[in-house]
Amino acid sequence: MIKKLSSQLLLILIVLSSKAAVGDWTVYPSYHNATYCEVAGNKLYVLASGALFSYNMEDNETLLYDNINTLSDIDISHIAYSKAIKALVIVYKNANIDILYDDESIYNISDFKNKTLPSKTINNIDIQGSTAYISTSFGVVVLDLENLEFSNTYNTGFNTYCTYLFNDRLYTGTSEGVFRGSTKDNLLDKNNWEKVNYYPTQAFCELGGELYCLIRDLGIYRLNDENNRLTLIVKNSGEKYHTIYNSGTEIVAPSKDKVTIIKSITEFTTYKTETGSSFIKKNGNTFWSCNSYSGVVECKIDNDRLSAIKEPLQPNSPVRNYCEFMKFTKDGKLLVTGGTLNYFDNIFHEGTIMEYDYSTLKWFNFPEETIKETTGLNYVNICSIDEDPTEPGHYFASSFGYGIYEFRNKEFIKQYNHLNSPLESVHKSGAYIERYVRIPTVEFDNEGNLWCINTGVKNVIKILKKDGSWLSLNYKELENLPTVAKPLLDSRGWLWITSLQGEPGLFCAKTNKTLFDTTDDEKKIWLNKFTNQDGISYDIYQLYAFIEDNNGHLWVGTNTGLFIIDNAENFFKNGIFKQIKVPRNDGTGLADYLMSGVYIKSIAIDGANRKWIGTNDNGIYLLSSDGLEEIHHFTTENSPLPSNNIESIAIDHTTGEVFIGTNKGMASYTSDATAPEQSLNENNIHAYPNPVRADYSGNILITGLTADCNVKIVDTAGFLINEGISLGGQYSWNGRNSRGEKVSSGVYYVLTYDSNGNEGVATKILITR
């Protein structure tokens, strides 16, 4: 008999088949903005958004490199290929160095990174043979690529942009001009360096036994090695040249809108390129153009310009490493925005909205240029986004400065600001009034009404109702506060609103279940200072995290630590916050406040009511439901987290995957808790993997359970093998018996009971050893 799978069951099977094992990490670096590339035989290495990918020019295979599968670090600043050792030298912004060989093996050199120096900024890397000359903010560091060791450090005291060995003389282009020293002399002695000229030089290269240099703002010159005279070859005009390099028989000089090919002192040709090129690599008759918007494009000469001959290379990835806000839609898609609350009017992140589809593992980056063209205004600092619960594919996104943007099927359709809606600008008049329509948050309620926080104005709360009409709510306590940010309608029907900084704190309104009528509300606000149950008061400067857990308790994350409201009625009366006390268990009987003094930026609640706490500079914590137990503490030292500065957290409650947004990009961790079901149903209970094959070493997951579900695993004879309690809707079994031994091949039954001991349901697992 052929059975048809329901779409819901098919979705479950797809999710299970692609589900990572508990404890697995995934990173999501952006590979979008291509800035540099290197040719290595039939392979093209591309530096994009601080990440690395390669393209095989023979079989068209693309490989993505990250700090889980290959690399030792993140945030690459420079790459350079050495033909002598057949390896790519990778330099990171923190001065860490990887050597990636053609056979995909890798060697890390962290000596320079670990040195204590006033500055370790690396400006460039020039490779000649098996020597890498690293130009730094203080001079030149020489790396022997054969022996994988630093052979010399020349502390010239000048900010050095480029280094080149020519006729036994080492040339450096610095902020103070060009210097050189003979390799026969002791170059550790600054007196053995001579100043050639005072022109700030960006790059050197050699052609036909002559030395050429690129002088900032001026152009490309030949530098006579004997008399130090400069001869102009090509003058900088329009977009300035980025660099110069030898492609074999020619010098190549790329700029944003052109590339010049120099064959001799008197022979050169300039070709137009696509606007926005950050680097162009010549390989035979082919050019590879790196572009901020379109990735890497293969081009060839077509009359007086370079023309693309293939579709751009741009791996599917986030458009940027911005992820200040993250939220899951009802159908399991992750929405990400990259804006910041530009309170001081000095940070302008490009308008960034991204969607990650877990079922296809694909990213979609919302359009940007069309918005700027349509509105005639900047498109920056997108702080939040939400999907209409009554119309999938209908989105609203907020900007801290330019109002609200409406999208349908990911296409921009309308901007709302002070001119066409009740939204208000912080400034009532002036030339830049349109820049100050500050909307940190938009969020739909269950009825399809869009709640908008309009900070810094009189009527902070604006509601775009489902019927298209607008409603403004006034609370005098919130008028003109500079960073009112997030609304929360709790399980009691109370409205809470946070103020982040400037005047940080909490506002609460008992709405009497009349949300759109404020006249019958009881209201209170707590600003700048919090007092705990022991009478200790804290000055609060930032309040970024506020969330209700599954028990109705409210968790507040501030710059000075973690606070709890476990009885909202009492809190409304006395304004006393609770700080959890964690016993020291050292015989003193003393306890410490949980996470006291820790700067908290984000909090999320998982399916087992556990708390994921993101900090400003100390990574992310997982706490037990009551906060008394620290289950995990992940940092860049013990995990692939891109940074210890955690901006946002979003949890896929179906899979248990925790997405973590940092100031340097995103990662996810597969946890052991999912959202619980309301009741046990054998059709919803699944084991993964199933069957369990001999080469599998991870945990076996049983999903589709109720909260605090009792799970027993027995063999075919009915003997108890393992038992425990589910975390949310999931139970994890390590495939071992009570003695810690791996169970043998066979069929094992999973017996499940709810927290009252009722409704026993069975599924089974096949294990093959």
Residue ranges and their predicted role:
Residues 767-769:
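Interdomain boundary/hinge segments at the C-termini of tandem beta-sandwich modules
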Residues 1-9:
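Bacterial N-terminal signal peptides that target proteins for export
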Residues 679-712, 730-733:
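Glycine-centered coil/turn sites that cap beta-strands in beta-rich domains
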Residues 67, 726-757:
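Short, surface-exposed loop/turn motifs with a glycine/proline- and acidic-biased composition
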Residues 710-721, 748:
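Short, glycine-anchored, charge-dense loop/turn motifs used at functional sites
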Residues 12-19:
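Hydrophobic h-region of N-terminal signal peptides that target proteins for export
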Residues 4, 20-685, 720, 751:
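Carboxylate-rich, polar loop motifs that coordinate divalent cations or form catalytic acidic clusters
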Residues 760-765:
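Edge beta-strands of extracellular beta-sandwich domains
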